[in-house]
């Protein structure tokens, strides 16, 4: 379930154009956004250490999708 929450969070970033969070935020700002996401969806909040490990795993999976969406948004503006 913990992995699924991080998966949903990163998919939410991709779908809702929150790319600045990934590329321009510090780790603690990114974690604050995750806490906000968990509170919105009533998920339990995991410790930042666990979050960091899972995000490293998932960011490699979604990196190209995030990057492509990010540059597409910049070009459109």
Residue ranges and their predicted role:
Residues 1-4:
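Phosphate-handling catalytic cores of nucleic-acid transaction enzymes
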